[in-house]
Amino acid sequence: VLSADDKANVKAAWGKLGGHGAEYGAEALGRMFCSFPTTKTYFPHFDVSHGSAQVKGHGAKVADALTTAAGHLDDLPGALSALSDLHAHKLRVDPVNFKLLSHCLLVTLAAHHPAEFTPAVHASLDKFLASVSTVLTSKYR
């Protein structure tokens, strides 16, 4: 459960992304594909090479979904319901992959915003991404 401090940290951190969300989303996906090659199996129709239009496009979708989540911290299940249905019933993504992408997102954010990436912000963003992952996998049962 996100505390009031966590929510404030997430909103502040997300606000500092500016117009870089899609860029960071694509970078995190690229990191995931490179570091965890088995994740590529969910994207057989993608050119998963660095900087491809498909990776950039999906990175933008990831960033948009997380921006939506950051704006609805008190109702993540409601805000992400359609996305949860998609991943559970149509895409059938192995839940562990959300943890892998979350890790890559944290690395990407830390690399771009080292001064703002304090231990408290790191912990809050980690809890936020874990909460999003839990919501996205909640309909797998």
UniProtKB/Swiss-Prot annotation:
One of its GO terms (biological process) is hydrogen peroxide catabolic process. Keywords: Acetylation, Heme, Iron, Metal-binding, Oxygen transport, Phosphoprotein, Transport. The modification Phosphotyrosine is found at residue 24. The modification Phosphothreonine is found at residues 108, 134, 137. O2 binds at residue 58. The modification N6-succinyllysine is found at residues 7, 11, 16, 40. One of its GO terms (cellular component) is hemoglobin complex. The keyword Repeat does not apply. It comes from the Eukaryota. Heme b binds at residue 87. Heterotetramer of two alpha chains and two beta chains. Involved in oxygen transport from the lung to the various peripheral tissues. This is Hemoglobin subunit alpha. It comes from Peromyscus californicus (California mouse).
